[in-house]
From Swiss-Prot:
Gene source species: Rickettsia africae (strain ESF-5)
The protein's name: Putative 3-methyladenine DNA glycosylase
Family designation: Belongs to the DNA glycosylase MPG family.
An annotated Gene Ontology molecular function: DNA binding
SUPFAM superfamilies (alphabetical): FMT C-terminal domain-like (SSF50486)
GO biological process: base-excision repair
Signal peptide, first to last residue: none
Length: 183
């Protein structure tokens, strides 16, 4: 694989659903580990009842109102971290949750679930508000991989379940052929 280069901030500063779908097949690089993003979910603004910013700006959600291309990491159930990327224009709270990845380096490993991927990668609350653009240790890179995906309702939430804002890879043939991953 060629040297990974972070995608530009403009990549994240767009419609959240566009970003969520285009993150599928991108490489997530974190402190020496590389994983292909295989599942995402969108959380969009104050009219989305499942979005953390639905009730307005708080200390916790402040990062969602900031510029795009930053990490938003939080704890759920008192034990699992979740990784999100801030999207859209500054002042509009939105983010993409990274729900699943396929690790390609240093080993071959499929991780389904935001808690599993954060635990494996070592992502925790100290990685909240990281700039993903000007960062050599934590970023998203485009490796030119296109993977087919399906659109479904978001999972693990109780509000906004009618939104078809979950995107999950349906066929990893390209991933297998290019990176010799095991299904």
């Amino acid at each position: 694989m060629n040297k990974l280069i972070p995608v530009p901030r403009e990549f994240f500063a767009r419609d959240t659903n566009v970003v969520s779908t285009e993150l599928i097949g991108k490489a997530l690089y974190f402190q020496g580990k590389t994983a292909i993003i295989t599942e995402t979910e969108s959380y969009i603004g104050q009219n989305d009842p499942a979005c953390h910013a639905a009730r307005g700006r708080t200390k916790r959600t402040d990062i969602m109102f900031g510029p795009a291309g930053f990490s938003y990491v939080y704890l759920i159930y008192g034990m699992y971290y979740c990784l999100n990327f801030v999207t859209e224009a500054k002042g509009f709270p939105a983010a993409t949750l990274i729900r699943g990845v396929h690790v390609i380096s240093p080993e071959n490993l499929y991780l389904n679930g935001p808690g599993k991927l954060c635990k494996y990668l070592g992502i925790n609350i100290s990685h909240n508000k990281c700039d993903l653009i000007n960062n050599n240790e934590f970023f998203v890179g485009d490796i030119g991989l296109k993977l087919p995906y399906s659109t479904t309702a978001r999972i693990g939430i109780t509000k906004g379940t009618d939104k078809l804002w979950r995107y999950v890879v349906t066929d990893i043939t390209n991933l297998i052929s290019q990176y010799n991953v095991q299904p």
